[in-house]
C-alpha cells in the first residue's frame, strides 16, 4: 500500500498535467471536441440514449473516460477507469476543491463525497483506478445515476 505522502504527491502531480483532458463537469459539451487531440486519445466513441449521450475516450495509458451529457448540452457526469488517473482538476472544474478537501480527510480508503450538489467516488491503487462524479441537480429527469460508471 502506498504511503499517504506518496499518494498525495501522485494526486498533485496528475492534477498538474499541462493539458486539459476533458469536458468539465457542469459545463457545456463544446469542449469535448478538442479533448481527443489534447489528451492524445487513441479512440473516441459517442453513444446517444433517449435522455443523454455518452462520449467515451481512451487515453494512451489505456484509461477509459466517459462524459455524460444532458440534452441541454451540459456535462452532468464523468467516469473513469484504468491504469492512470485522468486530469481530475480539468474534469471536475469548480468541484475539484471539494475533492481535494475530501482526500485530505480520507487517506488510504476509497473516497466518497456526497452532497445535494455533488457526488464523487474515487478509488483504486497503482495501475487500477476507477471513479465517477455527477451533479445531482443536472441529471436529466428519468436517468438512473447508476449508469454513470
What are these regions (language model features)?
Residues 1-10:
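Bacterial N-terminal signal peptides that target proteins for export
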Residues 3-4, 60, 85-86:
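Intrinsically disordered, compositionally biased low-complexity regions
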Residues 4, 23-24:
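Long, hydrophobic N-terminal alpha-helical segment
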Residues 9-16, 36-50, 105-110:
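Intrinsically disordered, low-complexity linkers and terminal tails enriched in Pro/Gly
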Residues 18-21:
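N-terminal signal peptide c-region/cleavage motif recognized by signal peptidases
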Residues 24-81:
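N-terminal secretory signal peptides
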Residues 69-106:
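Mature extracytoplasmic domains of secretory-pathway proteins
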Residues 95-149:
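Helix-rich interaction surfaces within compact, conserved domain-sized segments
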Amino acid at each position: 500500500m502506498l504511503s499517504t505522502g506518496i499518494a498525495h504527491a501522485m494526486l498533485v502531480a496528475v492534477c498538474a498535467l499541462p493539458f486539459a483532458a476533458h469536458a468539465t463537469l457542469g459545463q457545456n459539451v463544446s469542449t469535448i471536441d478538442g479533448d481527443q487531440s489534447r489528451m492524445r486519445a487513441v479512440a473516441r466513441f459517442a453513444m446517444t440514449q433517449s435522455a443523454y449521450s455518452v462520449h467515451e475516450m481512451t487515453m494512451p495509458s489505456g484509461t477509459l473516460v466517459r462524459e455524460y451529457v444532458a440534452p441541454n448540452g451540459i456535462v452532468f457526469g464523468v467516469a473513469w477507469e484504468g491504469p492512470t488517473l485522468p486530469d481530475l482538476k480539468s474534469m471536475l472544474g469548480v468541484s475539484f476543491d471539494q475533492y481535494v478537501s475530501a482526500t485530505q480527510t480520507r487517506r488510504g480508503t476509497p473516497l466518497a463525497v456526497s452532497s445535494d450538489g455533488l457526488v464523487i467516488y474515487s478509488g483504486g491503487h497503482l495501475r487500477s483506478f476507477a471513479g465517477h462524479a455527477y451533479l445531482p441537480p443536472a441529471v436529466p429527469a428519468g436517468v438512473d445515476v447508476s449508469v454513470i460508471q
